[in-house]
Amino acid sequence: MLSQVCRFGTITAVKGGVKKQLKFEDDQTLFTVLTEAGLMSADDTCQGNKACGKCICKHVSGKVAAEDDEKEFLEDQPANARLACAITLSGENDGAVFEL
């Protein structure tokens, strides 16, 4: 019998100067974690499909994979801006900090 291994981690989200630690499971998007925590609204968005650019956040610290198909939404944004829906979380993101 195969056992399914699920990895967890924690990120910190900062909104309005208030820090909140949020747990995640591998392969969840940052968008999902933030909306489930009530820190980001899914209303009037593409629902995490990398098509609207409304879930921009700032990557403050920690490890995050390089941006890929989100560049068109980030052209006029600071260098640390990312789309929450384009960040798929894994154990390597444990401890990362994002500002909303």
From Swiss-Prot:
Cofactor binding mode and count: Binds 1 [2Fe-2S] cluster.
Compartment list: Hydrogenosome
2Fe-2S ferredoxin-type domain segment(s): 9-100
UniProt GO MF annotations: 2 iron, 2 sulfur cluster binding; metal ion binding
Entries under Pfam families matching the protein: Fer2
Keywords: 2Fe-2S, Electron transport, Hydrogenosome, Iron, Iron-sulfur, Metal-binding, Transport
InterPro entries for the chain: 2Fe-2S_ferredoxin-like_sf, 2Fe-2S_ferredoxin-type, Beta-grasp_dom_sf
Residues of the propeptide: 1-8
Cofactor list: [2Fe-2S] cluster
GO cellular component, one term: hydrogenosome
Record: residues binding [2Fe-2S] cluster: 46, 52, 55, 85
Note: The propeptide may play a role in the targeting of this protein to the organelle.
Job description of the protein: Ferredoxins are iron-sulfur proteins that transfer electrons in a wide variety of metabolic reactions. It links pyruvate:ferredoxin oxidoreductase to hydrogenase.
Name of the molecule in the record: Ferredoxin
Organism (species): Trichomonas vaginalis
